[in-house]
Amino acid sequence: MSIKSDKWIRRMAEQHGMIEPFEPGQVREADGRKIVSYGTSSYGYDIRCADEFKIFTNINSTIVDPKNFDEKSFVDFKGDVCIIPPNSFALARTMEYFRIPRSVLTICLGKSTYARCGIIVNVTPFEPEWEGYVTLEFSNTTPLPAKIYAGEGCAQVLFFESDEICETSYADRGGKYQGQHGVTLPKT
């Protein structure tokens, strides 16, 4: 299994729609101001956060149960900047829609710009033949409110191609997050 280069990422995005919308280079400025970079890097793709958020709240004092998650634990927010309360988290989604080839698995890592501020981005791997918008989780590990910027980079996706095709892909299994749109809450 080897990591894929910028050339491969560009080819797969442009010829096979692997990433839409796709930025073939690195974008570091918008409207004359510096932003958290996004687009193609040497061996990965820096994804952007869309402007749809679900901010975790303790208003209802419920127990967090991944098998029976209460949607009322979130406040919906739409905007260019999301403020995450201290020691809390928010869910968001990518601006990009992904179509992962059958021979590929991705690993997604948070950008250091956020990590150095105590904001951790968590995303599970994109499995072979998974497609959809990626649900992102931003954890604010600090005792202060933290900002997340929509339309800017937040994490980097690394693409690994296997030496042989998997026997059963995510699509073959009928994965529960296949084709997701919007911010998707836990499913069992």
Swiss-Prot record:
Pathway: Pyrimidine metabolism; dUMP biosynthesis; dUMP from dCTP (dUTP route): step 1/2
Name of the protein in its database record: dCTP deaminase
InterPro entries, alphabetized: dCTP_deaminase (IPR011962), dUTPase-like_sf (IPR036157), dUTPase_trimeric (IPR033704)
Active-site residues, Swiss-Prot/TrEMBL: 137 (proton donor/acceptor)
Entry-linked PANTHER family: DCTP DEAMINASE
Gene: dcd
GO molecular function annotation: dCTP deaminase activity; nucleotide binding
Pfam family, one: DCD
UniProt organism field: Cupriavidus taiwanensis (strain DSM 17343 / BCRC 17206 / CCUG 44338 / CIP 107171 / LMG 19424 / R1)
